[in-house]
UniProtKB/Swiss-Prot annotation:
Name of the gene this protein is made from: OR10A4
Tissue specificity statement from the Swiss-Prot or TrEMBL entry: Expressed in the tongue.
UniProt key word rRNA-binding: no
Keywords from the named record: Cell membrane, Disulfide bond, G-protein coupled receptor, Glycoprotein, Membrane, Olfaction, Receptor, Sensory transduction, Transducer, Transmembrane, Transmembrane helix
Gene3D superfamilies cross-referenced by the UniProt entry: Rhodopsin 7-helix transmembrane proteins
Residues listed as glycosylation sites in the UniProt record: 5
Name of the protein: Olfactory receptor 10A4
Organism whose genome encodes this protein: Homo sapiens (Human)
Lineage, top ranks: Eukaryota, Metazoa, Chordata, Craniata, Vertebrata
Main localization (coarse): membrane
Membrane topology qualifier: Multi-pass membrane protein
Amino acid sequence: MMWENWTIVSEFVLVSFSALSTELQALLFLLFLTIYLVTLMGNVLIILVTIADSALQSPMYFFLRNLSFLEIGFNLVIVPKMLGTLIIQDTTISFLGCATQMYFFFFFGAAECCLLATMAYDRYVAICDPLHYPVIMGHISCAQLAAASWFSGFSVATVQTTWIFSFPFCGPNRVNHFFCDSPPVIALVCADTSVFELEALTATVLFILFPFLLILGSYVRILSTIFRMPSAEGKHQAFSTCSAHLLVVSLFYSTAILTYFRPQSSASSESKKLLSLSSTVVTPMLNPIIYSSRNKEVKAALKRLIHRTLGSQKL
């Protein structure tokens, strides 16, 4: 066979941003480190305030808390290794390390897609069927919906990662990305991957496009209900409860669809890296900022938390 004399790959090299100058990489390190810390602090703050404040115990904030946990996980999987490639040129990653990173990328990504759809359903019930909302979105139902979102991430991550790393890697080991995403890793496989690529497309449609269509359908019904409300105040109040989620969904899915539904030949590897940066680094930072700035209840809860903290320090 043509691969008999090739060396079996035991580690990979992340190309990351090695084409840039050392000075520019240092600037990117400072930028991404700042974004990373802001992301962690912002999402931890959302988690704390939705747990501690009695006014934020509704299903909407339960799901928001789950979203913040997912965003923290997403960042921990991708950003620390990327920072290492920028500041100390630590571009190598073991075979197991690459598989682990890819597994959790799939896990958090699929779980977030499903959770965003669940959050849209919560807003749909709250606005379109408010009388039955307490029954439909009870504690047990919310826990089941959240668990289903997390479990969806487990299933797709297990199937995809196990399949990819069962292929032989016996040639080049340079992954043209800043993390172990599936397309650049699959490009290094020395076997026929056509069946896997068909399955991967099916999984992408199922876990990205299908939840997006559910969200779209929910918001069509929500907007239709809002426009039929008689009072301007009622319209404003109803829309304000879902505007933050709608903005988060727009950011998340615009980059996801551009990244995974464009033909492989239509975009350069550098533009794909920029899109991936937007979805894996920038969006997780913006989510807590969006919710804390556009949601009146979250803003009020943050003010109460700050006042309590400052008051306890004075004592």
